[in-house]
Amino acid sequence: MARDYKIEDYRNFGIMAHIDAGKTTTTERILYYTGKSHKIGEVHDGAATMDWMEQEQERGITITSAATTCFWNGKRLNIIDTPGHVDFTIEVERSLRVLDGAVCCLDANAGVEPQTETVWRQADRYKVPRMVFINKMDKLGADFFNCVKMIEDRLGATPLCVQLPIGSETEFEGVIDLIKMKELVWKGEGLGAEWEERDIRADLADKAAEYREALVETAVEQDEAAMEAYLEGEEPSEELLKSLIRKGCIALAFNPILCGTAFKNKGVQPLLDAVVDFLPNPTEVPAIKGIDFKTEEEVVRRASDDEPTSLLAFKIMNDPFVGSLTFARMYSGHLETGISLLNTVKDKKERIGRMLLMHSNSREDIKECFAGDIVAIAGLKDTTTGDTLCDPMKPVILERMEFPDPVIELAIEPKSKADQEKLGVALQRLAAEDPSFRMKTDEESGQTIIAGMGELHLDILVDRMKREFKVEANVGAPQVAYRESLSQKGLVDYTHKKQSGGSGQFARVKIEFGPGEPGSGFVFESKIVGGNVPKEYIPGVEKGLKSVMDGGLIAGFPVIDVHAMLVDGAYHDVDSSVLAFEIAARAAFREAKSHCAPKLLEPIMKVEVVTPDEYTGGVIGDLNSRRGQIAGQEMRGNATVVNAMVPLANMFGYVNNLRSATQGRAQFTMLFDHYEAVPKAVEQEVIAKSA
C-alpha cells in the first residue's frame, strides 16, 4: 500500500518550554484548529487532551510526552508534547532525540526561565532547528521585546522576528506579519475566533518597517543571488523570503520568533503556518548514523522508504487497555504488522503484532508505517528506551541516548507482605518506562531503594504505583545520592596468594590510582610491557576494580571519576587465573583508601528564586544558611531573580519554607549542576550515618 502523505509533507516537531509557559494549552489549540479535537481541553480544569494520566490532570502539569498526529494545509504534523518541569528533563531529552524541529514556548512576562535554558541546551546538543512562540501576550507585564533580548542574551541565539505584537496585556489584538507586511487582527477571544488581514496602522508603520528591514537583511544572507539582488534594490518576493527563512532555520543560523496567546485563541493558526513553512521535513535534516551490527563500521540511514528498515524506541508506556506500548521513530524503510525485526542492542527478535497511531490517549490501529512516522507498537517483550529495531538482514545500532544519573533516593516497602511481589513488578515496569528512575536493594538492610531526578519525580512514581498497580507503599525520607572519589594519586602493590592443597591462587598487581576528569567515570588502562601480566588476565583486573566502584571506599556510595593504571605485576604458571587477578585488583582498590585520600562528593544544585523585591534579603539569607553560594541577582520586571549554587542535602522541604517566608509570592527552580567535595564536618556526619 502506498503512503498517504509524501515524506516531504511530514513535520515531526515537539513543543518545549519552562513549566507553565503554556505548552500544553498551545498543543490543545493546535489540535483544535487542525480538527482533531472536538472540544478544547483546559489545563485549569484538568481536561487537557494531551495530559492523559490522572496525576497530570490533577497537578495541571505534563509528565509524559504524548505523541499525536494531526493535519494542516495538506501537511502531516506529528507533535510531541514535552514536560517543562525540571524533574522530567529525561522526557524532553528523549523527544528531542527523535524530532526534526521544535517550537519553544516562552511566557511573555517571564521570558527565558531556567528550564528554558536547559531544554534549549538539549536541543543544541541534538542540533534541532527551532522557532520561538512568545505566548501569553495578554498577561500582565507581557513584554515581547524584552523576551527577544533575553533569547539573545541568555540563550546565545539569533532571534529573527517574523511577527510583531499589536498591543500587549489586555490591549493585545493580534500580530503584524512582517513577511506579508499586513496586520492579522482577531475578532473576539472565542474558540475558532476569526481574524482579518488589514493594512498596518500608521502608529506602528515605522516599527514594522524597521523590523522588516532587519528580517530581510538577515534572511538574504542565506543565498548569494538573493543577497546581490537585494543590494541592487530588489525586494525579495513573499515566497523567496519564506524559503530563505526556512533555509536559515534548518541550518541553525537563526530562530524565527512569533507571538500570540494560545489561551485567548490568538496567533495559533499563523504558528501552524510557520511550522509548515520553516521547520524541516525528515529529508532535510542530516541522515541518522549508526554502527553496523556485524562489521562495527559507521553506516548512514537516509529518510527513505527504499532504505533498510530501522526504528528507534524512544519511550515505553503502560496503556491500561493495550498493555506495554513502545513509541518508536521510523527513520528508514517501511514496516508492516506481522513482520519480525531484530533488536540489535539486546540481540533478540521482536515480532510486530499491532501498530497504533496515537492521538494523545486515543488510538487508531494501522497495518503499516513508513520512514518519518512516529508510531506506538504494542506487546514488544525485550525492547527498552534507546533500543534499535531493524531489518535482520541489514542490522544496525542507531546512536544511543544519554541518561543522567539520579540525584535523590528513598527507601520504599509495601504496606503489607502480600504486596511484596506486586511492588517488584510495579517498580520494574516503571523502570522500563523511565531510564532516569533506578532501583536497587540495599545489601545490608534488605530495603528496596528507588532513585530519581527530584522529589516530584519520585512522588509521582509512588503515586502511579498506587493508582496503576494498586500497591500501597511506605516511603522513607528522601536521601541524597552522594558519590565518592579520590583526592590524590597513589601507588598500590598488592599480592594475592592462597594455597590449600592442589593448585592455589596467585596474582600480583601494581596499580596507580588517581582522580579522573570530572564526568569521566572510571578509566582503566594497562601499561604492562613484556608479559609480566599475561594479556588474558588484564580484563580480570578491570572487572575486579569495577566491582569495588559500586560499593564505595568510605561510606558505601558509588565511586566516580577515577583513573586506574596497571603498571606492573607478576603471575604463576599454575596458580594464576583471571579470578585470582580479579581478587587482587579488588583488594588493591580497597587499599587505595589509605594512599589516595578518598573524599565524599555531593550534588550541587543550580537554584533560581524569583521573588518580590521586599523579600530579597530574607531569601538570600536563607540560601546562605543552607550552605548556598549566591551567584548573582538581577531585576526581572518588578521581581528580583536570585541565582545560587546550593547542596541538594540542604534543599529538602525548601518549597514550604519559601512559601511561608514570602506569603506564597516567590517561586524557585532547581537543576542538578555538578558534584563537589563535601566539607569535612558534613562528611564525618554522613559516614557515621551510613556506618
Swiss-Prot record:
Belongs to the TRAFAC class translation factor GTPase superfamily. Classic translation factor GTPase family. EF-G/EF-2 subfamily. Its main location: cytoplasm. Keywords: Cytoplasm, Elongation factor, GTP-binding, Nucleotide-binding, Protein biosynthesis. It holds the Pfam family EFG_III. InterPro entries: EF-G-like_DII (IPR053905), EFG_II (IPR041095), EFG_III (IPR009022), EFG_III/V (IPR035647), EFG_IV (IPR047872), EFG_V (IPR035649), EFG_V-like (IPR000640), G_TR_CS (IPR031157). Catalyzes the GTP-dependent ribosomal translocation step during translation elongation. During this step, the ribosome changes from the pre-translocational (PRE) to the post-translocational (POST) state as the newly formed A-site-bound peptidyl-tRNA and P-site-bound deacylated tRNA move to the P and E sites, respectively. Catalyzes the coordinated movement of the two tRNA molecules, the mRNA and conformational changes in the ribosome. Signal peptide: none annotated. It comes from the Bacteria. GTP binds at residues 17-24, 81-85, 135-138. GO terms for biological process: ribosome disassembly. One of its GO terms (molecular function) is GTP binding. The gene is fusA. GO terms for cellular component: cytoplasm. It is found in: Cytoplasm. It comes from Maricaulis maris (strain MCS10) (Caulobacter maris). PANTHER family: RIBOSOME-RELEASING FACTOR 2, MITOCHONDRIAL, TRANSLATION ELONGATION FACTOR G-RELATED. Residues 8-283 form the tr-type G domain. This is Elongation factor G.
